[in-house]
Design a protein with these regions (language model features):
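N-terminal beta-strand/beta-hairpin edge segment
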Residues: 11-17, 27-53
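Hydrophobic packing positions in regular secondary-structure scaffolds
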Residues: 46-50, 56-100, 106-419
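Short, surface-exposed loop/turn motifs at beta-strand boundaries within globular domains
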Residues: 8, 22, 37-39, 180-181
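Short beta-strand segments
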Residues: 22-28, 332
């Protein structure tokens, strides 16, 4: 069975030569980040008379016995300088936030675990528990025994590297993309500003994902990360957000930037956002998304399903297809299941619910919530009060986001930080 060792076992401990004489003190271990699930350890930084030197792993022995010996003939006396892609395990990882990609949480690296795998030493895991923290702080042998259940496999870990000089690394976008945008937003909100910037920079490689993450951020963090962007860049980001979310954010931007950003939006998005901004933010009009899936009364089931497939409407609004008459008034609504079960040639209206309820844009959100609850709906149509024309939908997720208090995820134990 592979023996796992604590990084702290070696830190600030003596390193001896082959004669057993002390030659210096271990400052850190150096690992190389790349495509390896477990980064290989390439050497150690040792301090001799105030000078930090690098010793490659091929000249180091004794690790299995919990000590470090120099097994070379002579030391390279040049000062240590890290190379691109190298991490110092203690300086860059220990006591810092890391991303647990499996759980979508931040963890604190209270201990780094290393092991010899097929003749090579590698970083195999992280212990985020309190026991290793107290062991390091108090300098005791408390809990030297490895608690395998507490160790997080380094293969599921992504470190922050923005603080690492000349690392030339960034958080891999493809790894973050496996998380839900809400999980990524939670990570950003719980991280430091610098760590959050690193995450935003990584997801920025996928503009749609970046917009999805921004929509999930709280207002404080949205404004924080827009601050350093030009008005044009801010408008590009908002143009990819849902119109209702873009309108909410524009409402919060400093007044001296608001108009410029609004006028920089594409014409179609700008028109929708301006319309939404005409409503009070706490009303159905302010909450609604003007984009929804609709078909005329003459549409068949096949045409309704084609409308869903070709639509750019977000997932929440995509769950319901509305049938509108020639005046744009809803006369039926169907979720996807009845449409999928029906024959392609059937009229969409024949499988739709025709007893519909609705709200008007001036209704406050509590009245909207009661209506949605009473009729057990997840998507509620908003009709123009004067003509009865359908102008948007309120979805249950947007409504909950407004009704629940700020920081509700932390209040209900859904924090993105593991302790």
């Amino acid at each position: 069975m592979t023996e796992i060792l604590h990084l702290s076992t070696f830190l600030r401990r003596a390193i001896y030569d082959s004669n057993g004489d002390r030659i210096g003190r271990v400052q850190d271990l150096v690992a190389r980040l790349g495509n390896d699930a477990h980064p290989p350890i390439v050497g150690a930084v040792i301090r001799i008379e105030g000078r930090d030197l690098f010793v490659p792993m091929k000249k180091i022995g004794g690790l299995r016995e919990g000590k470090m010996t120099f097994e070379g003939k002579r030391l390279d006396l040049r000062r240590f300088e890290r190379r691109p892609g190298e991490l110092l395990l203690a300086e860059d990882l220990l006591s810092r936030h890391l991303i647990n990609l499996v759980r979508g949480r931040l963890i604190i690296a209270n201990e780094i675990e290393i092991a010899e795998m097929e003749g090579k030493w590698e970083v195999v895991g992280v212990d985020p528990g309190r026991r290793p923290f107290f062991r390091r702080i108090l300098g005791t042998n408390l809990g030297q025994r490895i608690n395998a259940d507490a160790i997080v496999d380094f293969a599921s870990i992504e470190p922050f590297v923005g603080h690492v000089p000349s690392a030339r690394l960034r958080i891999p976008y493809r790894k973050l993309a496996k998380l839900h945008p809400a999980q990524i937003a939670d990570l950003v909100e719980q991280a430091s500003h610098e760590e959050g910037e690193e995450i935003i920079e990584a997801v920025g490689l996928d503009r749609e994902l970046e917009a999805d993450v921004f929509e999930e951020l709280d207002t404080e963090h949205q404004l924080e990360f827009l601050e350093d962007r030009t008005d044009v860049d801010a408008a590009r980001l908002l143009s990819r957000m849902e119109p209702d979310n873009a309108a909410d954010l524009i409402n919060e931007i400093d007044q001296d930037r608001r108009l410029t950003i609004l006028e920089s939006l594409p014409a179609d998005q700008q028109s929708k956002v301006r319309h939404l901004l005409s409503y009070n933010a706490d009303t159905a009009g302010g909450l609604m998304n003007p984009d929804f899936v609709s078909v005329p009364a003459t549409a068949t089931v096949a045409e309704a399903l084609d409308a869903v497939r070709s639509s750019n409407v977000p997932g929440e609004s995509l769950h319901v297809v509305f049938v509108l008459d020639e005046n744009g008034q809803p006369i039926g609504a169907s979720s996807l299941a009845p449409l999928v079960r029906a024959r392609d040639t059937d009229l969409a209206l024949s499988v739709a619910r025709t007893q519909l309820t609705h709200v008007h844009p001036e209704w406050d959100m509590h009245r909207v919530a009661r209506k949605m609850s009473d009729f057990n709906l997840t998507v509620l149509p908003v009709l123009d009060a004067e003509h009865g024309k359908m102008i948007g939908v309120v979805t249950v997720d947007d409504l909950l986001e407004e009704l629940l208090p700020q920081g509700w995820r932390r209040e209900f134990g859904m924090t993105a930080v593991e302790e």
